[in-house]
């Protein structure tokens, strides 16, 4: 196996859910493409890396300083849904039910993997909560909206597994002194599962019956 081939396989194998065998198949498939198409693919990856960053408020993927969700005045500013990853945010958006804002933690507490609270975007979340209590802007840099005096609700939508449960419990504890309403998705999601794989109907019910 050539060094170039091996190196390319190693990069694809770094992708979540892609093992060495799958990575090898992908590279073999790419080698079957016309060179012009491979060049277009590589340019697309470069454009992605240079043109996509993280939203300054919620850490969703965005081509601008703020993502489309945070920039949308029609979203409910008094609700912030906490998710572990951008893919979880995408799954919730697909339901079409939730119309609030988000906060992407960047993972879940997992001491075994070296992910501690300080490894996540928890400080940024607390700052958003503080800013909301002061001026009702949910931590954004925009001006307060006239008449917006609703109570802030933090929806803990971490994955229904050990790491997600640990993270949700930790967040509940540190948010208590801030006197904000917190809610959890209703039971019904399979234990040990991941939000990004839950079907839309189940996710809709979990949101409707949150407590």
What are these regions (language model features)?
Residues 1-16:
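Extended, structured, electrostatic nucleic-acid-contact surfaces
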Residues 23, 72-133, 150-158:
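Extended interfacial segments that mediate partner engagement and assembly in macromolecular machines
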Residues 34, 98-99, 126-132, 151-211:
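Long C-terminal interaction/binding lobes of large macromolecular proteins
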Residues 44-89:
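Cys/His-rich short segments
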């Amino acid at each position: 196996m050539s060094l170039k081939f091996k190196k390319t396989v190693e990069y694809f194998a770094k992708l979540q859910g892609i093992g060495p065998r799958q990575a090898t198949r992908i590279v073999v498939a790419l080698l079957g493409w016309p060179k012009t198409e491979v060049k277009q693919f590589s340019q697309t990856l470069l454009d992605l890396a240079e043109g996509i960053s993280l939203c300054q408020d919620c850490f969703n993927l965005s081509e601008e300083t703020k993502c489309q969700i945070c920039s949308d005045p029609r979203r409910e500013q008094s609700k912030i849904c906490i998710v572990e990853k951008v893919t979880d945010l995408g799954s919730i958006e697909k339901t079409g039910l939730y119309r609030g804002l988000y906060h992407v933690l960047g993972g879940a507490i997992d001491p075994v993997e070296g992910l501690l609270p300080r490894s996540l975007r928890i400080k940024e979340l607390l700052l958003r909560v503080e800013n909301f209590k002061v001026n009702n802007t949910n931590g954004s840099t925009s001006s307060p909206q006239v008449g917006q005096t609703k109570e802030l609700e933090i929806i803990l939508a971490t994955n229904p597994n050990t790491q997600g449960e640990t993270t949700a419990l930790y967040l509940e504890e540190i948010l208590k002194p801030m006197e904000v309403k917190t809610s959890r998705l209703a039971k019904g999601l399979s234990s040990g599962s991941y939000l990004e794989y839950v079907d839309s109907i189940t996710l809709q019910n979990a949101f409707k019956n949150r407590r």
